[in-house]
Amino acid sequence: RNITWTGNSVYSAETLNEVLKINKGDVYDVVTMEKRLFGGGKQSDFYVSQLYRDNGYLFFQIEPVELNIEGDSVDVEMRIVEGKPATLNNIVINGNDLTNERVIRRQLFTYPGNLFSQSDFERSIREIASMGQFDPEATMDPAKGWSILPREMDNTVDVVYNVTEKPSSQL
């Protein structure tokens, strides 16, 4: 029936509804709603969490709460805690024994002092993976290729890129 938003001050309910793409009268589908809130759908899909995280709101949280369930209709209240924008603090590169760090940093879109952006972070990972000097699978692997270290107490975040250099050719 209705989707309402509480706790949102950065984006209007209208903007959030445009990103959510669920309208009054649509079939209620929890899986689709969660993909449009948190991601996990197609790579090209834009989702509510990304909207916030692209503008520094790394500490953003959202909880959909089902209210007024009547027959086949349900109202959903989206409870948001926006938090404060996070600024990039340290950008660390590990594993580059042969490649000069400056060569890697030229590929990055994450800079100390800038607001954190999920899209810039993901683009930096793709750029490192496509350089040719590093194992792209290891670079793209969230378990070992990179880490985001948020510090909510001072609204900063450190980003660590762990590169795995390919063996150099020998004659």
Predicted regions: what they are:
Residues R1-L171:
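Periplasmic polypeptide-binding modules associated with outer-membrane biogenesis and secretion
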